[in-house]
Swiss-Prot record:
Protein name, as recorded: Dermonecrotic toxin SdSicTox-betaIIB1bxiv
Protein location: Secreted
Cofactor: Mg(2+)
The EC number(s) this enzyme carries: 4.6.1.-
Organism name: Sicarius cf. damarensis (strain GJB-2008) (Six-eyed sand spider)
Protein family according to the UniProt entry: Belongs to the arthropod phospholipase D family. Class II subfamily.
Cofactor note: Binds 1 Mg(2+) ion per subunit.
Superkingdom of this protein's organism: Eukaryota
Keyword annotations of the record: Cytolysis, Dermonecrotic toxin, Disulfide bond, Hemolysis, Lipid degradation, Lipid metabolism, Lyase, Magnesium, Metal-binding, Secreted, Toxin
Disulfide bonds: 44-50, 46-189
UniProt enzyme class: lyase
One example GO MF annotation: phosphoric diester hydrolase activity
Tissues in which the protein is found: Expressed by the venom gland.
Active-site feature positions: 4, 40
Length: 273
């Protein structure tokens, strides 16, 4: 269960208390591709305040504590951090610079270049395939800085509901054949059909297809849509209301089929139910 738009530091506890075991937050860049703040802005989901924010590096410092064993701030349940990268707000020419910057800030403030024991998995949410240079830069930077091992903790996810074959082609260009999630969804203000979601699930379940390991639906607020997504076999849901998802998961139909992921689970492996 991914808590959606958790952009203020005080919201982290709020969403975890509602039952989320993953959080998504928005990264806003300046015109040069430097990550500045966690901030969504207007418009955003119905019934939500769009303007909450924090300085990105301070947010990382806080979330490091929340995901570090034996830290007083530890919240054991939080296993995944989804960085919603607002690259569509800057020139595609700055995507590489943005990738370098986010990698360095994670190295300095989250992983602390090997001195941190923070253990959450990181999902890089890229809005459009045209911004794929962000991924190249991120990986180049880890390599150049001597921390390629952190690649094991990082997954890739394109969130713009683009053609799945087009996404596969870009992953092929980047040489990425693992640790790939696929999102499908729309703002909670609107309804969305299931055609593309079903296609993504079908590809996930195709033997030998290495470009989708997990599929999740966003942003779900109605229990009927949560049930529909679970029946289709999604790996996760993003919601403004994690407590509603918890209630649905406890229903007889789903209680034996789904559970919340923990650190004993590998987020990059296809689930074989």
């Amino acid at each position: 269960i991914m808590g959606h738009m958790v952009n203020a530091i005080e919201q982290v506890d709020e969403f975890l208390n509602l039952g989320a075991n993953a959080i998504e937050f928005d990264i806003d860049f300046d015109k040069d591709g430097i990550a500045q703040i966690t901030h969504h802005g207007i418009p955003c989901d119905c019934g939500r305040k769009c303007t909450k924010k924090a300085i990105f590096t301070e947010y990382l410092d806080n979330i490091r504590q929340v995901t570090t064993p034996d830290d007083p701030e530890l919240r054991e349940q939080l296993v995944l951090l989804a960085l919603d990268l607002k690259l569509q707000r800057i020139s595609s020419a700055k995507a590489y610079r943005a990738g370098e910057d986010v990698a360095k800030k994670l190295l300095d403030h989250y992983w602390q270049r090997g001195n941190s024991r923070a253990r959450a998995y990181i999902l890089l949410n890229i809005p459009l395939v045209e911004d794929y240079e962000f991924i190249r830069a991120f990986k180049d930077t880890l390599k150049n800085e001597g921390y390629e091992s952190y690649n094991d903790k990082v997954g890739i996810n394109f969130t713009g509901n683009e053609d799945l074959d087009k996404i596969r082609d870009v992953l092929e260009i980047l040489g990425i054949h693992k640790q790939v999630w696929q999102a499908d969804g729309i703002t909670s203000c609107f309804a969305r059909g299931t055609e593309r979601l079903k296609e993504a699930l079908e590809k996930r379940d195709t033997p030998g297809y290495n470009y989708i390991n997990k599929v999740y639906a966003w942003t779900l607020v109605r229990k009927s849509i949560m049930r529909r997504s679970l029946r289709l076999g999604v790996d996760g849901v993003m919601s403004n209301n994690p407590d509603r998802v918890i209630k649905v998961l406890k229903e007889k139909e789903f209680a034996d089929k789904f559970r919340l992921a923990t650190y004993n689970d590998n987020p990059w492996e296809k689930f074989r139910g």
